[in-house]
Amino acid sequence: MIRRPIYDFAAVFRHLTSPLSTSSRFLFYSSSEHEARKPIVSNPKSPIGSPTRVQKLIASQSDPLLAKEIFDYASQQPNFRHSRSSHLILILKLGRGRYFNLIDDVLAKHRSSGYPLTGEIFTYLIKVYAEAKLPEKVLSTFYKMLEFNFTPQPKHLNRILDVLVSHRGYLQKAFELFKSSRLHGVMPNTRSYNLLMQAFCLNDDLSIAYQLFGKMLERDVVPDVDSYKILIQGFCRKGQVNGAMELLDDMLNKGFVPDRLSYTTLLNSLCRKTQLREAYKLLCRMKLKGCNPDLVHYNTMILGFCREDRAMDARKVLDDMLSNGCSPNSVSYRTLIGGLCDQGMFDEGKKYLEEMISKGFSPHFSVSNCLVKGFCSFGKVEEACDVVEVVMKNGETLHSDTWEMVIPLICNEDESEKIKLFLEDAVKEEITGDTRIVDVGIGLGSYLSSKLQMKRKNARERRRHL
C-alpha cells in the first residue's frame, strides 16, 4: 500500500506569504477596468496570505488530492475565505481525477462560506460529469440545484438534455426531465425542443418529434431554422417527402431561409422517389429564396436524371451550373458521361470527356472504358481510338479491359497475340486492373500510340476513296 506523504502546509504557506519586497507585502492589483491599478490588500490577520495566492497554489497542483488538502488547510485558518474561483478550480480537478465523492464536500464548504450559489458552479459540475460519461450524475445535478434552492436556467436544462440524449437508454429520462422542468420553474426554450426532436427522429420516433413541434407553437416557443431542418430530415428519412415539402413551404411562408443541408436532403429524397420534376423546380426555386444552389445540389440533380435515363435533362443541369457561376467537378462529368453512355449517346459522352480533360480533371478509367466499349459495339473504331489517344496523351490510366478491346483493332494477329501475353504478365505483376501501359513496358506505350495514329490515318484515307 502506497502511503501519501505528509506535507508541512504551514511551511508551504510561510514560503508562499514571504514578502515580495519590504514595502509591498500582500499587494495585488484588481483586473476590473474601473478599479485599474487599485491595490487589493489581503487581510493582514490571515497567516497564509491572500485568497489569490492560495488559488494559484491549488491551480498549480497536478494531484487533485493534494489540491484538496491545501484547500482544506486554508479553510481552517482564521480570517481566511477562499475565492469563488478556488472552488471552481478544485471541482474541475476532483472531477477530472474521478474523485466525485469529494465534490459534495467542496459544495458544502462553498455554501457555508457565505458565497451565493451561482449557475457557474453547477455548469462546472455538469461539465465534469459529462466528461466522465456519467449521465446519472449529470441528471442528479438538476435536482442538486433545487436542493441548494437554486432555480436551474434553460442553459443548464439544455446541457443536461444534450448529455442524456447522447447516451443510449437515456432518451426517456431526458423526456421526463423536459416535461417536469416547467413544474420547477424552468421554461424550455427552442434549443430544448430541438434537442429532443433530433433525438426522437434519430430513434425512429418521428410522431413524437412532430408532436413536440406542435407543442412549441402552442406554448409560444418560436421554432428556428434548426427546428424545421430536424423535422425535414426526419420526414425524408422515413420516405415521407411530401410531408417534408409541406414543412419547407411553412418555413418559407414564415420568413425563414432554409439552409443548404435542408435543400440537399429534400433534393435527394425527391430524386430517390423519382419526383424529378418537383426536384428540378425546387432547384430553380432555391435561388429565388436566397440560397444559391451549390455543387452538391447540382450533382444530386444530375445523378437523379441519369438514374432515370434522362441524360439530356442532366446535360441541361450541367449547363445551368455554368450559367449560374458554379463550376462542375469530376463527379459532375463522370455521372453525366455514364448517363449518356447508358442511353447510347457515345458521341455526346466523348465531347464531355474532352471538355472534362480540357478543364484539368482526370477521368476515372471506367469513363474511358465505357466510351470505348460503346464505340466498339457499334463498329466505330476510329472514335474508340480517339478516346484512347486523348486519355493517353493526358497521362491517364486505361483499364486492362479497355486495352483488350482496342489492341485487336489496331494490330495484326501476331502483334495482338504478343501484346496480349505481355499485358497478362504485366497485370499479374502489378496485381491491378488499371495498370498504365507506359508504366510496365519500355516503349510499348509509344508503340501503341503510333499504331492508333496509323489506324486513324488509314480510316480517313479509306473514307476519302469511297
Curated annotation (Swiss-Prot):
GO biological process, one term: mitochondrial RNA processing
Subcellular location: Mitochondrion
Gene3D superfamilies in alphabetical order: Tetratricopeptide repeat domain
Main location: mitochondrion
Transit peptide: 1-34
Keywords: Mitochondrion, Repeat, Transit peptide
One GO CC term on file: mitochondrion
The protein's name: Pentatricopeptide repeat-containing protein At4g01400, mitochondrial
Pfam family, one: PPR
Signal peptide: none
Residues in PPR repeats: 118-152, 153-188, 189-223, 224-258, 259-293, 294-328, 329-363, 364-398
InterPro entries linked: Pentatricopeptide_rpt, TPR-like_helical_dom_sf
Family: Belongs to the PPR family. P subfamily.
Highest taxon listed in the record's lineage: Eukaryota
